[in-house]
């Protein structure tokens, strides 16, 4: 039985007592309810539905709301891009994506499913709608993906839980054994501020700090559009070790060990995790900072995994991807200004890609083309268009000159903001944001 406490005083539609939102209560047949302070429905098939108008609410680098129809449309647009490029020849057939609900992980799942007709299992940690709050964007993305996959006749199953934990690993392995037998591609795309070590229970927390000395440079306040200066104090204590424990390769190794032990990796299996290098202006806070140390650990694990997978004729890769607006990148100081400048230059020359174009190119032109084109360190580089001398020279010149006053001329800040809002399902032209929508959306395989 669903019970919703409401207050009917002085409103066209009642107010939810819990969240104070204006809501419209309807049955599946569409009839309005009114005249009672508490309404109960005896059957889920005719349950009350609190529709509401959902708007973006931004706090710092996070949007605390998400729009279900907008997220679904964003997923649909990514699918269309992949399908328009045709089938990936000799692509993966059974894919596990660890961290599959947003950003590069979501686009990886879409590219595999709709570019190669792959069966996919996705793992993520997202929050459903509850108590008048919207679900997270990743929840809506995953619901939309599963519905689109079902319509296309593709297997898709999702697991919502702590991917760092042993129980989630065990559940996923059981599903692979039962439904797929073995997987031929494992994508590791987790970004998290903390990780609980499954054996000891110790909680590690990551930090974004330079190493050795403080770092001062230009920064963009993405709320106000002001270009100012920011100083970030250096790592101290065990910051480096903590960050490496969260963002390094330890959990990737644990996943691959568990999958190998369970004998659910196919002959010729490939696994890939993601990294970023970027230009020198970002190195103190990224490549040479605490997160950079974690990525060094990731590359060490990649080399170890490559050896472990050799008996299966398998390969492990680190893919260095382009700087893009994602929920993870928006949290890194300095990087949003760089991305805004980069977007301006790459869009002007016609080389701009978003996450879906990046992941489609990774699968289509690198992992499954027979020509992965690794660099001298063995990494796959799909940041290659970003890092061309022509692009970097122009971005570097504009970095030196950019200020609050000329931001709109030198940078694509509007594009940055648009991309940020789209992550949460806002700003898509085909969605009517003035209409009420149902925030409670189910993920089919979790229902």
Language-model features and meaning:
Residues 52-76, 150, 281-297, 301-447:
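NAD(P)H-dependent oxidoreductase Rossmann-fold/reductase module
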Residues 117-155:
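Glycine-rich phosphate-binding loop and adjoining beta1-alpha1-beta2 segment
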Residues 98, 183-191, 270-275:
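Rossmann-fold scaffold of SDR-type NAD(P)-dependent oxidoreductases
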Residues 90-124:
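Canonical Rossmann dinucleotide-binding motif of NAD(H)/NADP(H)-dependent dehydrogenases/reductases
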Residues 16-19:
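Cysteine-centered motifs
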Residues 161, 189-198, 215-224:
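Conserved NAD(P)H cofactor-binding loop of Rossmann-fold oxidoreductase domains
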Residues 206-313, 320-343:
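Catalytic loop of short-chain dehydrogenase/reductase
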Residues 171-200:
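A glycine-rich helix->loop->beta "capping" turn
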């Amino acid at each position: 039985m669903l019970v919703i406490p409401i207050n009917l005083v002085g409103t066209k539609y009642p107010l939810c007592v819990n969240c104070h939102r204006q809501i419209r209560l309807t049955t599946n047949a569409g009839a309005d309810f009114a005249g009672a302070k508490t309404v109960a429905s005896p059957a889920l098939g005719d349950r009350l539905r609190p529709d509401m108008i959902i708007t973006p609410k931004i706090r710092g680098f996070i949007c605390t709301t998400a729009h279900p129809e907008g997220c679904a449309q964003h997923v649909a647009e990514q699918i269309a891009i992949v399908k328009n490029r045709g089938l990936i020849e000799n692509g993966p057939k059974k894919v596990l994506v660890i961290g599959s609900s947003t950003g590069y992980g979501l686009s990886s799942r879409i590219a595999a499913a709709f570019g190669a007709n792959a069966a996919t299992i996705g793992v993520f940690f997202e929050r459903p709608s509850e108590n008048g709050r919207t679900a997270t964007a990743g929840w809506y993305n995953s619901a939309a993906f599963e519905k689109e996959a079902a319509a296309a006749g593709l297997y898709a199953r999702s697991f919502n839980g702590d991917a760092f934990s042993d129980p989630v690993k065990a559940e996923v392995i059981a599903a692979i054994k039962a439904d797929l037998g073995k997987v031929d591609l494992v994508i590791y795309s987790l970004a998290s501020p903390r990780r609980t070590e499954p054996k000891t229970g110790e909680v590690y927390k990551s930090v974004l700090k330079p190493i050795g000395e403080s770092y001062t440079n230009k920064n963009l306040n993405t709320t106000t559009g002001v270009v100012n200066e920011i100083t970030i104090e250096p790592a101290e204590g065990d910051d480096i070790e903590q960050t490496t424990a969260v963002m390094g390769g330890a959990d990737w190794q644990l996943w691959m060990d568990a999958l190998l032990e369970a004998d659910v990796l196919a002959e010729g299996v490939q696994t890939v995790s993601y990294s970023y290098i970027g230009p020198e202006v970002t190195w103190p806070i990224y490549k040479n900072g605490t997160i950079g140390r974690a990525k060094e650990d990731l590359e060490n694990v990649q080399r170890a995994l490559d050896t472990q997978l050799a008996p299966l004729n398998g390969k492990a890769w680190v893919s260095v991807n382009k700087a893009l607006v994602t929920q993870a990148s928006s949290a890194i100081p300095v990087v949003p200004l760089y991305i805004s400048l980069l977007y301006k230059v790459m869009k002007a020359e016609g080389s701009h890609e978003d996450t879906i174009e990046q992941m489609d190119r990774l699968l289509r032109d690198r992992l499954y083309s027979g020509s992965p084109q690794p660099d001298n360190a063995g990494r796959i580089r799909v940041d290659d268009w970003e890092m061309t001398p022509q692009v970097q020279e122009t971005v570097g010149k504009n970095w030196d000159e950019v200020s609050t006053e000329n931001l709109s001329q030198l940078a694509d800040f509007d594009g940055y903001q648009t991309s940020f809002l789209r992550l949460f399902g806002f700003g898509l032209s085909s969605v009517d944001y003035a209409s009420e929508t149902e925030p409670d959306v189910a993920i089919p395989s979790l229902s």
